[in-house]
Design a protein with these regions (language model features):
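ALDH superfamily catalytic-core signature
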Residues: 29-30, 35, 41-175
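PLP-dependent aminotransferase-like
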Residues: 1-24
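A short, hydrophobic C-terminal helix/tail in secreted or cell-surface proteins
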Residues: 176-181
């Protein structure tokens, strides 16, 4: 409704809801679709490119996320806190979340301590509750994926500085942070 209220002609903006394998495949292969713009996983991006290739469609992809915060010793004193809080938005489920923090060695220990303090201060609760907190992840599959990533980090040599196991009964996970690995 808002699109039409601001004056866009019908057909200029179309929003199609559905799953990637069904609706996404149909749209990316359809001969009347000239351009596909997608933000999401690298796996899905590869599939879109394959589907769009036969029709020589224009494709714009924003894939994978995993942006990094690079923090040097002369950075703003609040850079670590802002970086941690940015990754926690939307319960950490934003494709543009800065999920890595690359810190100059001279301030590494201080940054780890600050990150742990900030993470420890973030409440975790149900989204129906009022207040400043993060809520559950979207579903069991995402919860299991996150738990697997945490375990992979530990298996590869990272040490958890905050957090631990999640709360599978309500798909909540503790806010984890690991040191370099």
């Amino acid at each position: 409704d808002l699109i039409h209220e601001v004056g866009f002609p019908k057909g200029v903006f179309n929003l199609v809801n559905g799953d990637g394998r069904g609706v996404g495949t149909y749209l990316t292969k359809h001969p009347d679709i000239d351009l596909v713009s997608f933000t999401g996983s690298t796996r899905a991006g590869r599939e879109i490119l394959r589907n769009a290739a036969d029709g020589l469609k224009k494709v714009s992809l924003e894939l994978g996320g995993k942006g990094g915060n690079i923090i040097f010793s002369d950075a703003d004193k609040d850079a670590v806190e802002r970086g941690v809080r940015s990754v926690m938005l939307n319960s950490g489920q934003s494709c543009d979340a800065p999920t890595r923090m690359i810190v100059q060695r001279e301030i590494y220990d201080e940054a780890v301590k600050k990150a742990a303090e900030v993470i420890s201060s973030i409440a975790i609760s149900a989204p129906s509750e009022q207040g400043d907190h993060i809520g559950p992840v979207v579903n069991q599959k995402q919860y299991d994926y996150i738990q697997g990533l945490i375990q992979k980090g530990v298996d590869e040599g990272a040490s958890l500085i905050v957090g631990g196991t999640g709360r599978p009964n309500c798909l909540l996970y503790t806010s984890d942070a690991a040191d370099e690995f």
